[in-house]
């Protein structure tokens, strides 16, 4: 039996979100409310694709169409919003034997691809999967250029206490965190205003480095407003009653991710080390088994993250383009053209 692909509409939001919750690859950003936020702030058209075998759902694949002049571009996730991963999320395949699982997976993916080609006919397609999406062969078998990318996770299922957790870090953060315990600082879960403040701090840091920010305050606060309470959670470190730094965490119940934040602080308090440690303690308190330090692809940044002794996980970026778009991208690389179209072609991850 073939896989039938349809587009979920807003009336099916609850059903879609149940699929997200059931899928090992489902993330905060797969939720229907989050997808609508991505649509609102990317200027893209959203297609939440659902694959069915008969009446049984086998997977979801949210994609976004962007148009620049004569070109149609498809992204999952859309670029320039700081979203680390999206892509396909599979349903009810873990209990299948390997042969049947691979067959169902491939048919679902190729049916979605057929829908995309028939309805959008893009010249360029770019997908970044979640690290739970372990088999990227369907992309490679359908003419995508597939590349591995990396992120860091810290397993916390054994629920270490504060000192046990510190003891797992390298020498430098162990010393810094222990030495800071007599300082008058606090780390607390914040509110919407703190979400906006942390986001603006990240934006300011990008601009100080002459880099283009990949998110906006309006986008992140809309996510905070629309997703279930506690899904987007600001963690704020204050010293003597004044905000110093903070992280924006996302929480799916089985994984907490440090998504945004951690702008450099010029002071003698190890503020970012402390707020990261408290983020992990927050995960332990909520009985969440994984804390993710999103992104392990930039050497300068990994040097800082690695001192918390994380484990690496692999996810995949997959790109497919027509000959004309390959020529345009090659021209961009050679000339460093900063046009709006070409700046979208290679989403960057930390």
Which role does the model predict for each range below?
Residues 3-70, 130-151, 157-159, 164-268:
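A conserved beta-strand-loop-helix scaffold within acyl/acetyltransferase catalytic domains
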Residues 22, 119, 183, 230, ...:
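Structured helix-beta-strand junction loops
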Residues 65, 132, 140-163, 286-350:
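Active-site/acyl-donor-binding loops of N-acyltransferases
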Residues 69-144, 253-310:
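Acyl-donor binding region in acyl/amide transferases
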Residues 79, 213, 263, 317-320:
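Short, acidic/turn-prone active-site loops that include or flank metal/cofactor-
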Residues 172-175, 198-201, 233, 282, ...:
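A general structural signal for short secondary-structure boundary/capping elements
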């Amino acid at each position: 039996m073939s896989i039938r692909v349809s587009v979920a509409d807003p009336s099916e939001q609850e059903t879609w979100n149940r699929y997200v919750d059931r899928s090992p690859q489902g993330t905060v950003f797969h939720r229907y409310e989050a997808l609508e936020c991505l649509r609102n702030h990317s200027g893209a058209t959203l297609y939440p694709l659902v694959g069915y075998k008969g009446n049984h759902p086998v997977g979801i694949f949210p994609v976004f169409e962007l148009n620049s002049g004569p070109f149609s571009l498809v992204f999952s996730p859309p670029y320039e919003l700081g979203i680390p991963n999206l892509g396909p999320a599979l349903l009810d395949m873990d209990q299948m034997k390997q042969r049947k699982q691979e067959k169902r997976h491939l048919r679902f993916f190729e049916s979605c691809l057929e829908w995309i080609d028939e309805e959008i006919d893009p010249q360029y397609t770019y997908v970044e999967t979640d690290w739970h999406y372990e088999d990227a062969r369907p992309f490679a078998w359908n003419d995508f250029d597939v590349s591995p990318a990396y992120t860091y996770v810290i397993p916390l299922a054994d629920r270490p206490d504060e000192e046990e957790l510190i003891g797992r870090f390298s020498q430098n953060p162990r010393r810094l965190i222990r030495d800071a315990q007599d300082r008058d600082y606090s780390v607390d879960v914040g509110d919407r205003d703190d979400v906006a403040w942390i986001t603006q701090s990240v934006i300011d840091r990008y601009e100080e480095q002459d880099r283009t920010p990949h998110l906006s305050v309006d986008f992140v606060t809309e996510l905070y407003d629309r997703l279930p309470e506690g899904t987007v959670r600001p963690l704020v470190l204050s010293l003597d009653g004044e905000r110093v730094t903070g992280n924006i965490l996302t929480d799916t119940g089985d994984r907490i991710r440090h998504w945004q934040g951690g702008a450099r602080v010029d002071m003698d308090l190890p503020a970012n080390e402390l707020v990261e440690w408290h983020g992990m303690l927050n995960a332990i308190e909520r009985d969440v088994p994984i804390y993710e330090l999103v992104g392990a692809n930039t050497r300068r940044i990994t040097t800082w993250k690695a001192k918390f002794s994380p484990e690496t996980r692999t996810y995949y970026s997959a790109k497919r383009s027509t000959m004309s778009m390959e020529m345009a991208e090659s021209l961009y690389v050679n000339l460093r053209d900063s046009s709006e179209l070409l700046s979208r072609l290679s989403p960057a991850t930390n």
